[in-house]
Regions:
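Membrane-interface extramembranous regions
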Residues: 2-152
């Protein structure tokens, strides 16, 4: 199964800084969508306290993990950042699906609505980060601090 998922090892990219930078940018995208929600939704009606706390935690987490990926001088920090970024992405996707399927107090307008653009963008950014990290784990992409020592 691994051989199929990793495309037999025939497709691989050795761009560790680009892949790591893309991962950081995707996490900043998740944070930006939550900043947008916090900035625009109070004007339309009061946000429930638990959504504001969740959004603030996601913003802080995404920015910290993105900073760890982008600036992490210690290779261990960057590697751990990928796993925390994936964990954060799974949480964002889970909460996104939960708020659209399950009725939550003070979020009745969100239940059943799949056209709320900020949530869709956060879902897409988090999903893209998970997909990118999966390609790193499968060896298709290389992320900092790893390098491929290929010789032709």
């Amino acid at each position: 199964m691994f051989r199929v998922l990793s495309l037999g090892g025939y497709v691989a990219f050795d761009l560790p800084r680009v892949v790591t930078g893309l991962g950081a940018i995707l996490l900043v995208g998740v944070a930006a969508t939550h900043v947008y929600v916090l900035a625009t939704q109070p004007a339309q009606g009061a946000l429930p306290w638990y959504l504001a706390v969740y959004a603030a935690a996601v913003i802080a987490g995404c920015l910290l993990v993105g900073l760890a990926l982008w600036v992490g001088r210690n290779p261990h920090v960057a590697q751990v950042g990928w796993y925390f970024g994936s964990l954060l992405s799974v949480v964002v996707i889970g909460v996104d699906l939960l708020t659209r399927v399950v009725y939550l107090p003070a979020l009745t307008g969100m239940t059943g609505r799949w056209d709320f653009a900020p949530a869709s963008f956060a879902f897409a950014f988090a999903g893209a980060f998970l997909a990118l990290h999966t390609t790193v784990l499968l060896g298709i992409n290389v992320a900092y601090p790893q390098r491929q020592l290929w010789e032709d």
